[in-house]
Curated annotation (Swiss-Prot):
Swiss-Prot/TrEMBL keywords: Acetylation, Cell projection, Endosome, Golgi apparatus, Membrane, Repeat, Secreted, Synapse, Synaptosome, Transmembrane, Transmembrane helix, Ubl conjugation
Organism: Homo sapiens
Motif (PPxY motif 2) on chain: 64-67
GO CC annotations, alphabetized: cell cortex; dendrite; endoplasmic reticulum; endosome membrane; extracellular region; Golgi apparatus; Golgi membrane; perinuclear region of cytoplasm
Residues modified as N-acetylalanine: 2
Motif position, PPxY motif 3: 74-76
GO molecular function, one term: WW domain binding
Topology of the protein relative to the lipid bilayer: Multi-pass membrane protein
Gene that produces this protein: NDFIP1
Name by which UniProt lists this protein: NEDD4 family-interacting protein 1
Region (Interaction with UBE2L3): 2-41
């Protein structure tokens, strides 16, 4: 019995020392592995990033805009003001004086008129004299109507000059004043020709200016 206890006491220190040695080896290996798996320090990453971005700047790549510039949007009022300024012509009031190449459509035909309006105002001014002239000239807005009124009034003036000159109801009215008779006669003839010739020119305007990009239209009555 004593021998067994002595042998057991001799074996226990040997086992304890061997177990202690293995435990020390494992503890010494764990710090080495933890040191190998640890991330690099932040300072080294910052230095590498700075070097990379310096290389990007030196290579000529454009810098991205700042956050304030990229996220700043115009307000609704500013956007509407910019849109309104973009639609304002550089020279205001000039487009109204011009008619485009392809703009001789129905609207311009209403401004120019047709032969029916010309003949209507012509006979109104011819039959009703100055009353018909003023009515036809003021009530019509087309070139045909106004030129017809001018032409009809000129022919009406010639008619009344001839009536007064050769009528027996006005004896001696132009005695000694034949120059005045010729003045009114020539004036009426010029008015008649002016209205007729100008209307003929206006009718040919769509064909004459069809090849021009911009055409200024001005009616002088």
């Amino acid at each position: 019995m004593a021998l067994a206890l002595a042998a057991l006491a001799a074996v226990e220190p040997a086992c304890g020392s061997r177990y202690q040695q293995l435990q020390n080896e494992e503890e010494s290996g764990e710090p080495e592995q933890a040191a190998g798996d640890a991330p690099p320090p932040y300072s080294s990453i910052s230095a590498e990033s700075a070097a990379y971005f310096d290389y990007k700047d030196e290579s000529g790549f454009p810098k991205p805009p700042s956050y304030n510039v990229a996220t700043t949007l115009p307000s609704y009022d500013e956007a509407e003001r910019t849109k309104a300024e973009a639609t304002i012509p550089l020279v205001p009031g000039r487009d109204e004086d011009f008619v485009g190449r392809d703009d001789f459509d129905d609207a311009d035909q209403l401004r120019i008129g047709n032969d029916g309006i010309f003949m209507l105002t012509f006979f109104m001014a011819f039959l009703f004299n100055w009353i018909g002239f003023f009515l036809s000239f003021c009530l019509t807005t087309s070139a045909a109507g106004r030129y017809g009124a001018i032409s009809g009034f000129g022919l009406s003036l010639i008619k009344w000059i001839l009536i007064v000159r050769f009528s027996t109801y006005f004896p001696g009215y132009f005695d000694g004043q034949y120059w005045l008779w010729w003045v009114f006669l020539v004036l009426g003839f010029l008015l008649f020709l002016r209205g007729f010739i100008n209307y003929a020119k206006v009718r040919k305007m769509p064909e004459t200016f069809s090849n021009l990009p911009r055409t200024r239209v001005l009616f002088i009555y």
